[in-house]
Structures are given as structure tokens and as C-alpha cells.
Swiss-Prot record:
The chain crosses the membrane at residues 11-31. InterPro entries: CusB-like_dom_1 (IPR043602), CusB_D23 (IPR032317), MFP_Efflux_Pump (IPR050393), PHBA_efflux_pump_AaeA (IPR022871), RND_pump_MFP (IPR006143). Its main location: membrane. Belongs to the membrane fusion protein (MFP) (TC 8.A.1) family. GO terms for cellular component: plasma membrane. This is p-hydroxybenzoic acid efflux pump subunit AaeA. GO terms for molecular function: transmembrane transporter activity. It comes from Serratia proteamaculans (strain 568). Keywords: Cell inner membrane, Cell membrane, Membrane, Transmembrane, Transmembrane helix, Transport. The gene is aaeA. It is a single-pass membrane protein. Pfam families: CusB_dom_1 (PF00529), HlyD_D23 (PF16576).
Length: 311
């Protein structure tokens, strides 16, 4: 009888342990698959493609790659003598047409004063027409001069904002064309996170929720706030054929891959001071309305938080 009781006790303990193991595995699976977190997150920043608005030789590139620059700082200088000469020519044209217009204005005024007793009405009208033509040429010359001034001003390319110069691939002496990208400027204080959360993890996610960001291969924990969720993503299962009809890819009903949706997370100000390079990877955990305290939660929850941040 005693042996039977011991046997029953062992079986009961075994069943209880198995049941607890199943519950733990189930909770871990739910926690892993449904809680709002992802390892697929990228540091992102506003990047300005710096391209000149004029064409010519680069005469000065006072930069080094990955340099921090201030708004208004000179980035590129392009062939100023050529554009200074163009402005001088435009000024000369304006001066010429101003003199010519003054002369034609006096001549037309004299003919009007003399009137038809001294000359024909046709000659008077002809003088007025010549004056109008010269005045139009003067207006065109003035407009050309203003464009020459603008071109000369734009031979000096300046930083549109504070930020870091990166991927500098031009040097003094090279010929650069209008609109060709010379360098990229990563705006300071513009860093944010794009966290690609599976659609199954978006339930309950709200603007203003707090987030923890752990860069790949780092123990540093950064913080941010959910700003927005993408309003749409590309539907890879549907295209439009040549007749305008939808073409739907075949899909196995028992195999459905969750679509990833970009969630924009704004970094806290203190983390903007020392951001990771744009394009690098991070793990993101949405903690709800408040930041997660390091000593809060059950040991199981804390363990799961730690495990999923390896990456």
C-alpha cells in the first residue's frame, strides 16, 4: 500500500511538472508571437541629397567624409570665374539697352511734340514701336542679369541644415553637372526608428506608447515613443494585368505569413545626441504607456524580455 502511494505521488508530480512545462511553453509562445516587439528595426534619419544647381569645375571642396557641419557652411565651390564673367556680360547688356531705351524715348517724345505738321503719323507710330521693342529687350536683359546673379550665388553650395556629411565622392578639379548628387547630408536630431512589426502584433498598439530600443550587438538601451503606424504596405499577392484585372497569387490556406508593417518611433532627446548610424539594426520592444522598470515583472517576463533582445 505504501509503495502504491509513493507510485501515485510520483505520477502526480510528473503530470504536474509536465502540465507546468506545457503552460510555460504556451505562455512563452504567445509572448514571443503576439507581444509587440521585433528584431527587424532600423535606425533612420532625414537625408538630404546635396546636388549643385549649376554646372562646372569644382574649385574647392572644404570637407572631409563624415564631418559634422553647421547650417550655411560652405560645402562646394563651383567655377566662380565663369559665372562672374557671365554676370559681367549681363550687366553690360543691361547698360546698353538702358542707353538705347533712353535714346529711343527721347526720339519718340520729340516726334510726338512736333506732331503731324512736321512728319507723318506713320513715322510717329514707328518711333513708338521701336521704343516698345527696345524696352522689351531691356526687360529681357534685366531678367538675364538676375539669372546670372542667381547662378553666381549658387556656385557656392551651402549646408541646408546641421548634420553629418557622408559618402563624399567628389574632389576639387572634377567636373560636376547640374542636379548630380555630390554628397549626402544626414540631418542632426532627425534620427528615428522604423520598426517592422508583424501584423499580428499591432493589436493594442497606440500612438504615444513607449518603446525600448537595443542596437544590434550592444547592451545599450535607448528609449522612444511610437509616432505612427504606416497607413498601407505593398500587396505582394496581387498585381494588375494588361487588361486592368487583378491577378491574385495562389495561397496555401494553412500557410499564412504575417505581413510586416513599418512603425515609426521617435527617439528621446537624450538618445538623439549619440545615435547609431542610419541603416543599422536594432531590437524594439513596445512597453505600453510607460517605460519598463528594470526590476519590474515576474522573473519569467524579465527572462523573456532579455532573451528576445539578443540579436
Amino acid at each position: 500500500m505504501k509503495n502504491f502511494s509513493i507510485k501515485i505521488t510520483r505520477i502526480a508530480i510528473t503530470l504536474i511538472l509536465v502540465l507546468l512545462g506545457i503552460i510555460a511553453i504556451f505562455k512563452a509562445w504567445v509572448f514571443y508571437t503576439e507581444s509587440p516587439w521585433t528584431r527587424d528595426a532600423k535606425f533612420t534619419a532625414d537625408v538630404v541629397a546635396i546636388a549643385p544647381d549649376v554646372t562646372g569645375l569644382l574649385t574647392d571642396v572644404p570637407l572631409v567624409d563624415n564631418q559634422l557641419v553647421k547650417k550655411g557652411q560652405v560645402l562646394l565651390v563651383i567655377d566662380q570665374p565663369r559665372y562672374q564673367q557671365a554676370l559681367a556680360e549681363a550687366n553690360a547688356d543691361v547698360a546698353y539697352y538702358q542707353t538705347l531705351a533712353a535714346e529711343k524715348r527721347r526720339e519718340a517724345g520729340r516726334r510726338v511734340r512736333l506732331g503731324v505738321q512736321a512728319m507723318s503719323q506713320e513715322e510717329i507710330d514707328q518711333a513708338n514701336n521701336v521704343l516698345q521693342t527696345v524696352e522689351h529687350q531691356l526687360a529681357k536683359a534685366v531678367a538675364t542679369r538676375e539669372l546670372a546673379k542667381l547662378d553666381l550665388e549658387r556656385t557656392t553650395v551651402r549646408a541646408p541644415a546641421d548634420g553629418w556629411i557622408t559618402n563624399l565622392n567628389v574632389h576639387a578639379g572634377e567636373y560636376i553637372t547640374r542636379g548630380s548628387v555630390a554628397v549626402a547630408l544626414v540631418k542632426k536630431n532627425s534620427f528615428y526608428i522604423l520598426a517592422y512589426l508583424e501584423e499580428t502584433k499591432l493589436n493594442g498598439l497606440n500612438k504615444g506608447d513607449r518603446a525600448e530600443i537595443t542596437p544590434l550587438g550592444s547592451n545599450r538601451i535607448m528609449h522612444g515613443t511610437v509616432d505612427s503606424v504606416a497607413a498601407a504596405v505593398n500587396n505582394s499577392s496581387s498585381t494588375v494585368n494588361s487588361k486592368g484585372l487583378a491577378s491574385i497569387d495562389s495561397n496555401l490556406e494553412w500557410v499564412r505569413l504575417a505581413q510586416r508593417v513599418p512603425v515609426k518611433i521617435l527617439l528621446d532627446d537624450k538618445d538623439q545626441l549619440h545615435p547609431y548610424p542610419a541603416g543599422t539594426t536594432a531590437t524594439v520592444v513596445i512597453t505600453g504607456k510607460n517605460d519598463r522598470a528594470t526590476d519590474s515583472g515576474s522573473p519569467f517576463v524579465r527572462l523573456m524580455h532579455r532573451l528576445r533582445e539578443f540579436g
